[in-house]
């Protein structure tokens, strides 16, 4: 099975990107001349094939290639000059991928207590983020450098969201060329891990506020609230622009469509990203699901913060009321959208890539429905059913188990 999905060659990349993972072809070419990259690539390929086909021999072989690549990458990172080479960054990105492809058994008698899949994954992501920072902006302006930068961008943002704190990547203040709607989305969402950490620290400090500090604390809370609302409005504008691009492409293809059908929040088949997310290639589909996931996390955190800040103000400044959060800022709709399209990740032609692209949105939606007490809901069940029997779904299921998301299914 191919790792990358079968892309429509007619796509021009203006919406979501021509390739779902443009760094993969560059790494394949690099592997022709670099042994360490080749070892890392073989480790990923054998791990994926081994677990999908239940072939233990391939899995063991994959672990050997992984160990070789890991050792050589570690050696290269000790050299200030060698560490900056594209091949080292490529190896680091493949090691991140391997942690999603490997499968640590959940059986008590076979589980290695020294291994923690999510910790290993986060460690590789964090290290790769620091390497991006060390290499500097100029090394990511070449074609391969840009592809490698793109390859670590989403895992870095996901790691920041999952830990609710910034990492070396999300703290970068680089102005790289903005190529498409996916690039613009990631630029908008990049500050959110820092904002989530600020939310958490604000609430943590609430219990230690003295009488002479309440005004300063409230002012800081209002600043955070306004920052979050600004990002929300920017995300809404991004969605409207993406829908407009979809309409323009449909019109240029000769289809008669009413532009009013592409207005946010009204009824209609193609009035939202849900209606068009499967019409413009796998890259655009993945971008939409990542967008919903980020909105679900940001909107839910914002509403909780708004409630806590208002409660604090009621105690210290009775009568003062915060501005209302817009009705469309709700975590419910993004989670519902993910649930309704989750099966498309395992559609024919999606490749093994889909099992990895699905983990962040599906795990977040599963967690959301479990948290809100709806494990028996159709949305929850539809997501779990799509990867129970699929070969690529097996890898996604195992990684979900490894990061502790699957517990609601087994309780």
Describe the predicted segments one by one.
Residues 102-107, 140-144, 350-352, 399-401:
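Acidic, Ser/Thr-rich low-complexity linear motifs
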Residues 51-54, 216-217, 319-320:
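Glycine- and acidic
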Residues 58, 84, 117, 217-220, ...:
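Residue-level recognition of alpha-helical structural elements
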């Amino acid at each position: 099975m191919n790792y990358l999905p079968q892309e429509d060659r007619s796509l021009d990349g203006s919406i979501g990107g021509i390739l779902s993972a443009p760094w993969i072809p560059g790494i394949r070419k690099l592997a022709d001349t670099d042994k360490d990259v080749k070892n890392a690539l073989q480790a990923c390929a054998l791990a994926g094939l081994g677990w999908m086909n239940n072939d233990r021999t391939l899995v063991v072989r994959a672990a050997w290639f992984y160990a070789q690549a890991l050792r050589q990458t570690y050696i290269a990172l000790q050299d200030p000059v060698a560490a900056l080479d594209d091949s080292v960054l490529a190896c680091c990105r493949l090691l991140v991928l391997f942690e999603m492809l490997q499968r640590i058994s959940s059986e008590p008698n076979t589980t290695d207590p020294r291994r923690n899949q999510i910790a290993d994954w986060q460690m590789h992501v964090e290290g790769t983020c620091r390497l991006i920072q060390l290499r500097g902006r100029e090394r990511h302006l070449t074609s391969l450098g840009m592809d490698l930068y793109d390859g670590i961008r989403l895992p870095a943002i996901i790691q920041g969201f999952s830990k609710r704190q910034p990492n070396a990547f999300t703290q970068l203040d680089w102005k790289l060329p903005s190529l498409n709607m996916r690039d613009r989305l990631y630029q908008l969402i990049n500050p959110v891990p820092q904002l989530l950490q600020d939310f958490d620290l604000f609430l943590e400090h609430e219990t230690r506020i003295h009488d002479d500090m309440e005004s300063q604390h409230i002012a800081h809370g209002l600043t955070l609230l306004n920052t979050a609302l600004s990002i929300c409005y920017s995300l809404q504008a991004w969605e409207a622009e993406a829908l407009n691009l979809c309409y323009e492409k449909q019109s240029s293809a000769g289809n008669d469509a009413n532009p009013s059908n592409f207005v946010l929040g009204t009824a209609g088949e193609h009035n939202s990203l849900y209606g068009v997310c499967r019409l413009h290639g796998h890259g655009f589909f993945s971008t939409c699901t990542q967008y919903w996931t980020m909105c679900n996390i940001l909107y839910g955190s914002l509403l909780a913060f708004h409630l806590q800040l208002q409660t604090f103000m009621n105690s210290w400044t009775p009568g003062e009321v915060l501005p209302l959060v817009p009705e469309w800022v709700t975590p419910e709709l993004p989670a519902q959208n993910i649930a309704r399209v989750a099966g498309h990740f395992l559609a024919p032609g999606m490749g093994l890539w889909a099992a990895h692209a699905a983990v962040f949105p599906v795990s977040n939606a599963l967690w959301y429905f479990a948290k809100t007490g709806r494990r028996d809901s159709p949305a929850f069940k539809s997501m779990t059913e799509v990867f129970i029997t699929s070969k690529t779904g097996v890898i996604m299921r195992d990684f979900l188990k490894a990061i502790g998301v699957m517990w609601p299914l087994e309780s």
